[in-house]
Amino acid sequence: GRYANARGSEPTWTPRAMRSLAEAEPSVFWLDDRSAPPALPSLVGAVEADLVVVGGGYTGLWTALHAKEADPDRDVTLVEAATVGWAASGRNGGFCASSLTHGEANGLDRFPDEFDTLERLGRENLDGIEATITKHGIDAEFERTGELDIAVEDWQVDELNEFARLLAEHGTDPVLLDREQTQALVHSPTYLASRYDADGVALVHPAKLAWGLRQACLDLGVRIYEHTEVTKITSDGAGLALRCPFGSIRGRQVALATNAFTNLLRRLGNYIVPVYDYVLVTEPLSPEQQDAVGWEGRQGLADLGNQFHYYRLTADNRILWGGYD
């Protein structure tokens, strides 16, 4: 959609690209949903808790949920600076993968000795996510349809074959599909081959998952305060004191689940680099458009480039695709 001008300075948008974006809405697709729950009250005054969880994304929500399930008498409080699921947990492609190493190839390269254990734990983790969704009746549009890792360049076909050989050495029986088999699943002439991971990836509505976990926590008695930023944590005898704009919390234990927002423990800044990409979402496909695309298995799709692109269908049959700028 963009090309550089003759001097190689700022790119110029083509008329066709401009027209294609004329009716686009620059918003977060998942969070802009009519099922979004109303915000919970902010913390006002002083409270105490056995465990204080800072951050209302997936990590914080699951920490609070597991802590309460493990000990129903434990007093658990969760605070979120904005609203639950507002940041990365509500702004992603909705691929729920079993890999703990951001892909098996990455795991084989960096953790070869631990790879088998990491893969086993990752599968158990994905099973646990599905079990939690089922147990608490969370309507997160969870579809365990798997993923196609797709070669779109000749060199990627060779890389795919080598990757399959390495997986076989670790006891995995990878399913490789040639050009014709891949295009039979999704009708794209650019697809040259693929690996089909039928069970290791699920699709999910990210925001609905966060909101469902929020409700599960509330049902178990977790106190949740939204629009409550923790501005400072200090030691306080046998516990910790958390300062907020309109109140404070004294906690025996604190779990920081703040992802890239590391200011409460500044030394973490040396270990975390925020990474982002963009997604676009179409209008719902018509039956004729769905027939033209194929994709009856509703698998997640991702190409094999280092700065890869990914594609998926939503519950109402829109195509969501994303990748790095």
Model regions and ranges:
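Extreme N-terminal leader/targeting segments of oxidoreductases
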Residues: 1-51, 69-70, 74-75
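Flavin (FAD/FMN) cofactor-binding and adjacent substrate-gating region
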Residues: 17-26, 31-33, 102-108, 131-212
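Glycine-rich Rossmann-fold phosphate-binding loop(s) that bind the pyrophosphate
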Residues: 55-59, 81
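Glycine-rich FAD pyrophosphate-binding loop
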Residues: 68-91
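Glycine-rich active-site loop/strand segments that organize a redox cofactor
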Residues: 91-120
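Active-site substrate-recognition segment that forms the wall
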Residues: 94-96, 127, 135-143, 230, ...
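A non-catalytic, amphipathic alpha-helix used as a structural packing/dimerization or gating element
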Residues: 113, 117-131, 162
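Helical element adjacent to the flavin cofactor pocket in flavoenzyme catalytic cores
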Residues: 158, 165-168, 194-252
